[in-house]
């Protein structure tokens, strides 16, 4: 039971950190490359 409580207290914190950093990364990419639907270095 203690392991379940530890998991339930750690998982939301890790999810918040992950989604927060992902949102920050997307915001910075959109700030550096505005309105980029397709990046030029990905086109072959």
From Swiss-Prot:
Record's keyword annotation contains Transmembrane: yes
Check the record and name the Pfam families matching this protein. Answer: PSI_PsaJ
Q: How does it sit in the membrane?
A: Single-pass membrane protein
User: What does the entry give for GO biological process?
Assistant: photosynthesis
Q: Where in the cell is it found?
A: Plastid, Chloroplast thylakoid membrane
Segments passing through the bilayer: 7-27
Alphabetical list of InterPro entries matching this protein = PSI_PsaJ (IPR002615), PSI_PsaJ_sf (IPR036062)
Q: Please indicate which superkingdom the organism of origin belongs to.
A: Eukaryota
Q: Which UniProt keywords apply?
A: Chloroplast, Membrane, Photosynthesis, Photosystem I, Plastid, Thylakoid, Transmembrane, Transmembrane helix
Return the GO cellular component terms, semicolon-separated: chloroplast thylakoid membrane; photosystem I
Relate the protein's function as given in its record: May help in the organization of the PsaE and PsaF subunits.
- Give the UniProt family note: Belongs to the PsaJ family.
This chain's protein is named Photosystem I reaction center subunit IX
Species this protein is from: Illicium oligandrum
Gene designation per UniProt: psaJ
């Amino acid at each position: 039971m203690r392991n379940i409580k530890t998991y339930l207290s750690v998982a939301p914190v890790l999810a918040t950190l992950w989604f927060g950093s992902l949102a920050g990364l997307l915001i910075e990419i959109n700030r550096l490359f505005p309105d980029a639907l397709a990046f030029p270095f990905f086109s072959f």
